Amino acid sequence: MQKLKQQVFEANMDLPRYGLVTFTWGNVSAIDRERGLVVIKPSGVAYETMKADDMVVVDMSGKVVEGEYRPSSDTATHLELYRRYPSLGGIVHTHSTHATAWAQAGLAIPALGTTHADYFFGDIPCTRGLSEEEVQGEYELNTGKVIIETLGNAEPLHTPGIVVYQHGPFAWGKDAHDAVHNAVVMEEVAKMAWIARSINPQLNHIDSFLMNEHFMRKHGPNAYYGQK
């Protein structure tokens, strides 16, 4: 697990490097599918002092199997998503400014241009609000459930992120670093959408044929973007 702990540590350290977190407002995890174990950031530990050995290993029920700290308070959300989506290898949660602003507004981040379409096939959805019973019950678990409810039958790697109403963004990917990459993109396109709509409030969505081309040339069965 040491290699995975190092990867998760490095991915967590990327959050402040890319300006996605303030103080300790974020967490990254990754899963070892063969062992059924998840490595995640410890709760409330400052990035300035955090080490790879501080990462916490939990099983799929959330029981700590390795580590001296308590795992992130969002662990149950991560675990619920891993259980539902076998294609996920890493998950990240932040309170990055612009993506969180869309979450607080209760709005999906609209697909307005090709930067968005290179990574997200359509709008980045916003969940419904959690009920009082859901919040007072198993809050973090129910956060995972409302993400799954919102995604429905969508392929999660075609929509590698979401904003949770009145809370903030979650992103995911094939591994921890891919998840952070998608979180960075989400923050950037959230900022772009806010600026674009400020310039032109009547702005609608990117043309569907242009969105299809940009997404499929990177992620489709006949993708040709980048190097083999």
Curated annotation (Swiss-Prot):
| InterPro entries documented for this protein | Aldolase_class_II_sugar_metab, Aldolase_II/adducin_N, Aldolase_II/adducin_N_sf, UlaF
Q: Which gene encodes it?
A: ulaF
Which keywords accompany this UniProt record? Carbohydrate metabolism, Isomerase, Metal-binding, Zinc
Q: Which cofactor does it need?
A: Zn(2+)
Catalytic reaction equation(s): L-ribulose 5-phosphate = D-xylulose 5-phosphate
Q: Which residues bind Zn(2+)?
A: 74, 93, 95, 167
Q: Which residues bind substrate?
A: 26-27, 43-44, 72-73
Homology family: Belongs to the aldolase class II family. AraD/FucA subfamily.
The molecule here is called: L-ribulose-5-phosphate 4-epimerase UlaF
Q: In which pathway does it act?
A: Cofactor degradation; L-ascorbate degradation; D-xylulose 5-phosphate from L-ascorbate: step 4/4
Cited function: Catalyzes the isomerization of L-ribulose 5-phosphate to D-xylulose 5-phosphate. Is involved in the anaerobic L-ascorbate utilization.
Q: Which residue positions are annotated as catalytic?
A: 118 (proton donor/acceptor), 225 (proton donor/acceptor)
Q: Which GO terms describe its cellular component?
A: cytosol
The record's section on NCBIfam families has: PRK08193.1 (NF006047), PRK12348.1 (NF009003)
Q: Please provide, alphabetically and separated by semicolons, the GO molecular function terms listed in this UniProt record.
A: aldehyde-lyase activity; L-ribulose-phosphate 4-epimerase activity; zinc ion binding
Q: How is the cofactor bound?
A: Binds 1 zinc ion per subunit.
Q: Which Pfam families match?
A: Aldolase_II (PF00596)
Q: Which CDD domains match?
A: Aldolase_II (cd00398)
Tell me one GO biological process term.
Answer: pentose catabolic process
